[in-house]
Every structure is written in structure tokens, then in C-alpha cells.
């Protein structure tokens, strides 16, 4: 299972085409929180994107996380000169634990992203309520802050 997750992330990294701005193309960075790890974002249109995370949890049992979300961005929500957007969207999460307590479930990501002017980065804060459905129903949260670099 770990090999499939790693191969999927590598495929994503090498398959995407770099771009010149944060509203299109591919960005790669880090996220600190629950879990902590690698964050990737691929823009599918000017206001929608695919978001991926590959991380490790340091809380309770050590565990590996993989998530994917389809995000919708709401620009110009705040009256400011800065490029700040609200984003939200559904996704899925796989948590792999050493003692066979692995879980699969849904998540709903909500966050804010700031794109500094004339830079190839974005800075984000997000929280994601989780509803595990396999092997049993359980409710929890993920969240974190991060930064991504968008390739030219």
C-alpha cells in the first residue's frame, strides 16, 4: 500500500506541466500540522484545483496520511489589496497505521490562501473535518499551515 501511495505522488510530480502563476499549473511545498508533510496543488481552472497531501502524524500512533481534495476558490471575498482567497472542497483521506488500524474516509477542506504579488509562492491555512467510513465510522479533524512554490 505504501508503494502505491509513493508511486502515485511521484507520478503526480513528474506528469504535471509547470506554469507561470499560482492560478494555473503545479505547486509543491510543505504543510505543518496534523499531519506534517508534503503538499501539492494542481490548478484545473482559474478557480478550481486538485490538492494533494502526503504526511506523517506524530500524535498517538505514528501514522502515514494521504489525501486528495477538489477545491473551489472564492476570490475578492475580502476587501484588501492583497490576493487572499477562501477555498473549500470535498476529498478523501487514507490513514495507514502499523497495527492494521488503517482508515479510509471523506474530508471537507476549508482554508485561506494568500498569494504574495509577483512571487511564485502561496501561503495557506486550512482545516478539514474528517469522516472515516472504513473499517468503522469515526469523526476527527486535520489542519495545518503551509507554503508551496509554483514552478515556472
Segments (PLM) and residue ranges:
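Sequence/structural signature of outer-membrane beta-barrel proteins
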Residues: 35-37, 55-61, 75-77, 93-99, ...
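Short glycine/proline- and aromatic-enriched beta-strand/turn motifs that initiate or cap beta-hairpins
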Residues: 20-58, 65, 150
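N-terminal signal peptide c-region/cleavage motif recognized by signal peptidases
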Residues: 14-18
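Positively charged n-region of N-terminal signal peptides that target proteins for export
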Residues: 1-4
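Residues on the lipid-exposed face of transmembrane beta-strands in outer-membrane beta-barrel proteins
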Residues: 30, 38-42, 54, 68-72, ...
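Short loop/turn motifs that connect adjacent beta-strands in outer-membrane beta-barrel proteins
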Residues: 20-25, 47, 75-84, 100, ...
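Predominantly the C-terminal beta-signal and adjacent terminal strand-loop region
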Residues: 61-63, 117-152
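Residues that define the transmembrane beta-barrel architecture of outer-membrane proteins
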Residues: 24-26, 34-36, 48, 62-66, ...
Amino acid at each position: 500500500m505504501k508503494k502505491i501511495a509513493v508511486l502515485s505522488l511521484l507520478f503526480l510530480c513528474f506528469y504535471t506541466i509547470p506554469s507561470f502563476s499560482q492560478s494555473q499549473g503545479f505547486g509543491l511545498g510543505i504543510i505543518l500540522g496534523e499531519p506534517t508533510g508534503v503538499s501539492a496543488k494542481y490548478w484545473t481552472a482559474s478557480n478550481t484545483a486538485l490538492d494533494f497531501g502526503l504526511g506523517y502524524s506524530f500524535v498517538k500512533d505514528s501514522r502515514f496520511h494521504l489525501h486528495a481534495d477538489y477545491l473551489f476558490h472564492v476570490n475578492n471575498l475580502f476587501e484588501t489589496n492583497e490576493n487572499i482567497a477562501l477555498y473549500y472542497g470535498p476529498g478523501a483521506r487514507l490513514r495507514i497505521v502499523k497495527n492494521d488500524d488503517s482508515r479510509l474516509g471523506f474530508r471537507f477542506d476549508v482554508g485561506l490562501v494568500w498569494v504574495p504579488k509577483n512571487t511564485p509562492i502561496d501561503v495557506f491555512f486550512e482545516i478539514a473535518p474528517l469522516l472515516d467510513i472504513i473499517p468503522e465510522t469515526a469523526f476527527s479533524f486535520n489542519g495545518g499551515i503551509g507554503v508551496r512554490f509554483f514552478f515556472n
